[in-house]
Amino acid sequence: MMLPQWLLLLFLLFFFLFLLTRGSLSPTKYNLLELKESCIRNQDCETGCCQRAPDNCESHCAEKGSEGSLCQTQVFFGQYRACPCLRNLTCIYSKNEKWLSIAYGRCQKIGRQKLAKKMFF
């Protein structure tokens, strides 16, 4: 007994739609990882920060930096070594840092006037 072609095509279409939506191996925007869960890249986490532990090779979802905490804006293989700052803070680097070295800064709150000065001068 042979299935009609249109029924076979319909079955294949539903099968591929299932694979594209629910059969996905990476988390979707509705299936993001929570804090302290193991992650592979920043996009997997709710916070947007997948941080690699300095003492081992494990990485986990971490909170973004609060005022005074260590921060970094460079991404290494889809992960941070220190999470970037929260939305209302800026990562400020020391002036004596080398350009090519791995630079860590501190999260600080900056007034709008200082930002405007930095942008134009």
Curated annotation (Swiss-Prot):
<keyword id="KW-0964">Secreted</keyword>
<dbReference type="GO" id="GO:0007586">
    <property type="term" value="P:digestion"/>
</dbReference>
<feature type="signal peptide">
    <location>
        <begin position="1"/>
        <end position="23"/>
    </location>
</feature>
<feature type="disulfide bond">
    <location>
        <begin position="71"/>
        <end position="91"/>
    </location>
</feature>
<feature type="disulfide bond">
    <location>
        <begin position="49"/>
        <end position="83"/>
    </location>
</feature>
<dbReference type="GO" id="GO:0008047">
    <property type="term" value="F:enzyme activator activity"/>
</dbReference>
<keyword id="KW-1015">Disulfide bond</keyword>
<dbReference type="GO" id="GO:0005576">
    <property type="term" value="C:extracellular region"/>
</dbReference>
<protein>
    <recommendedName>
        <fullName>Colipase-like protein 1</fullName>
    </recommendedName>
</protein>
<dbReference type="GO" id="GO:0016042">
    <property type="term" value="P:lipid catabolic process"/>
</dbReference>
<keyword id="KW-0732">Signal</keyword>
<feature type="disulfide bond">
    <location>
        <begin position="45"/>
        <end position="61"/>
    </location>
</feature>
<feature type="disulfide bond">
    <location>
        <begin position="39"/>
        <end position="50"/>
    </location>
</feature>
<feature type="disulfide bond">
    <location>
        <begin position="85"/>
        <end position="107"/>
    </location>
</feature>
<dbReference type="InterPro" id="IPR001981">
    <property type="entry name" value="Colipase"/>
</dbReference>
<dbReference type="GO" id="GO:0032094">
    <property type="term" value="P:response to food"/>
</dbReference>
<comment type="similarity">
    <text>Belongs to the colipase family.</text>
</comment>
